[in-house]
Amino acid sequence: MSHAVARRQEFAADNLAARKVGAEPLIEGLKRIHGAAPAFDSYWRSEVLPLLNSGFRPPIAEGFNRFSRADEIARVIDKQVAHELAVGKADPYDTHPSLRERIAALEGFDRRGETRDEAPAVSLLTGVEVLEVDLLRTMSAEAGNLKPIQWQDVATAVYLPLWTQAAEWYADAFQGITLEHLPEAITQENGIASRLRPKEGEKLDADRRKAKAIFVTGAALSVLLDRHGWRTSVQPGEPVLLEHDSSIVDPFDVVGALAKGTMTAEAWRTLCATAGISALELRPASAASSPALE
């Protein structure tokens, strides 16, 4: 009974909002909420938490705006909204009506003359950074000690150090491998995966070993290209990209594609030749003997 009452209250609130600001802005806002809400968990886990765990505090609201506008994420959000509009139905235990039901209840409003303001809702707030710090303090008392960081700086300050650490830990797995021979090294039985020595307490079955090999090889490739003057870009919702002149490489995607066979060795070698990186050695030059082998 209480859930049914809550749903009626939501309909009443929607009716009031439509009379105050117009049905069209309300409908568009509801669509954005229903599309973006499922995406926020992915944004938080994949984009925000790695920075918080490294001691940095990015602009969270700004980052989610970027994340939700990224091409692939925007397609997923649009698909989610389309699904809700097509088959969405409230469960008896839901406190809110479905998106389809809420929009249907607004169809009777006259939308002529309504104006649309495309500014995000966060623009109505002042002191967003302070509010974000307060939010983080509800999760950890140490939130005030986090260093502010802008999204354009996360590659250099956070990810490259993490990738360097991973590449150097498993450096011996890359011994003698140049980039032109990466296709064989990532696919052959005696390649990179077989050379990985687990850390203390780490268990690597065949699948985990393969996944680990793809990740650490992508990390090593990222570090290598960055140290040879490539520009590294890590933005919310976007793939990792390294760029130099007209060449663009998504290191983790490329290594995964080579491992799965969806990118041919010939295509990779052509890319390497064009970029002049064929002879570069994958093993980090700064690495001593791998700690995993000591």
Model-derived features: where do they sit?
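Cytosolic-facing loops and C-terminal tails of multi-pass membrane proteins
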Residues: 1-6, 11, 15, 19, ...
